Amino acid sequence: MSIEKQKVVRKIKKKSFDVEHMNRLNQFELDQWQKEMQNVIRENTITFVDSFASTGKTFCALHYAAQQYLADPTCTITVVRTPVEAGDDKIGALPGDASTSMEGKLGVHFTSTKAILSDLLGAGRVACDEGKRIFFTIPNFVLGATIDGILIADETQMLSPLTMKLILERIGAGGKCIILGASGQLYEDSKKRNGLRDAMKRFFNEDGSKKYEKIGRYSFPLEAVKRDDVVRDVITAYGIG
């Protein structure tokens, strides 16, 4: 087979492969609020989503990123999560290299993010492109980097304001940044200020309106919570979100 024919065959196989994965992605239906969230993401360079737990905001952000990843072969997905420990259990330093220690400290949160993306794109695709077009990392490891693709920062209520600033400054030309969190979802008393709450005050007016053209926000209503109805009562009782 000639070189030109080989190129054509590879191109056809790749197109078929991408169509297969796009069909897989299209099997996942978004609810009305998740569709609204994605519309806000499309309209802005930076989108803040400060909402209750269990509204599907992480899934929705990864779903959007997966669409762009399949549509553009140059698009990258970078997921940033903080290794800050929550609650009273302090596990300290962990053995292993940076990757294993990071996964250990982030525990189920880091694993669940990978699992969602694996459901959307296929575990094989994620494993193949991890470290190439798909990255799971912590704030310290993006210091000095320029991220031109989709940058998703999750659980950002656990960040300090300066760490939030570090993440927001990574956005490259044509990139998008999606900031996820629940500013009231804190499980320990910290001397550091809530980075998400601080950012919301900096970038938006008291009535929620924009201060900057390319920076938007979205909040899910309480009825969007997908866990048992009693969780809504818990959120209401604590007066947080």
Language-model segments: residues:
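Conserved helicase motor core of SF1/SF2 NTP-dependent helicases
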Residues: S2-N26, Q32-A153, Q157-G241
